[in-house]
């Protein structure tokens, strides 16, 4: 499970709730949250959902909607922000990880400004935006990634 997501969840939610993973892949983060008692749903291309288009879950609203390393793969990045807002309950939290401009490996990257601009005229309010480095030790990788993390809530 993404360690920063786990830290965020433990800090922001004293009790397990309901979460949606936009771009769940092999469901690693979903399983991690389920081990913490969360009820989780997840979608991505493997489940037949193209996140370049607005997505609304039949199980919405959620207490938490998160997306790890997906927004940089989308042609229509702002649509992901609208999908987050559409699926969050009022006061619900969101969590996004993507690659920051200093990352030399990722093909598409964001500056803090460019990522923040996606939230203009949406129902979401950014509470935190931070940059940091992580070591990628997956086979064949062995390099640092520069990460941009954005968290906040639905107004």
What are these regions (language model features)?
Residues 1-17:
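Conserved alpha-helix/loop element of class I SAM-dependent methyltransferases that forms part
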Residues 16-25:
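Conserved class I S-adenosyl-L-methionine
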Residues 40-57:
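Adenosine-cofactor binding site in Rossmann-like domains, unifying the SAM/SAH pocket
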Residues 66:
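A conserved beta-strand element that flanks and buttresses the S-adenosyl-L-methionine
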Residues 69-73:
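Short catalytic micro-motifs in class I SAM-dependent methyltransferases
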Residues 79-90:
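A short glycine-rich, Lys/Arg-flanked "PGG" loop and its adjoining helix->strand segment in the class I
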Residues 92-99:
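Conserved beta-strand signature within the Rossmann-like core of class I S-adenosyl-L-methionine
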Residues 108-123, 128:
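Short alpha-helix
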């Amino acid at each position: 499970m993404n360690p920063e997501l786990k830290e965020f969840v433990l800090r922001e939610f004293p009790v397990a709730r309901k979460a949606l993973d936009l771009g769940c892949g092999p469901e690693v983060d979903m399983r991690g949250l389920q081990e913490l008692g969360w009820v989780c749903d997840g979608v991505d291309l493997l489940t037949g959902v193209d996140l370049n288009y607005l997505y609304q879950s039949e199980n919405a609203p959620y207490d938490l909607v998160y997306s790890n390393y997906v927004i940089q793969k989308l042609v229509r990045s702002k649509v992901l922000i609208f999908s987050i807002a559409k699926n969050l309950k009022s006061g619900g939290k969101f969590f996004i990880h993507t690659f920051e401009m200093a990352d030399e490996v990722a093909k598409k990257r964001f500056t803090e400004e460019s990522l923040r601009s996606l939230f203009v005229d949406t129902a979401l309010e950014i509470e935190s935006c931070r940059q940091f480095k992580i070591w990628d030790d997956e086979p064949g990788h062995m390099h640092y990634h520069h990460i941009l993390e954005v968290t906040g809530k639905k107004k």
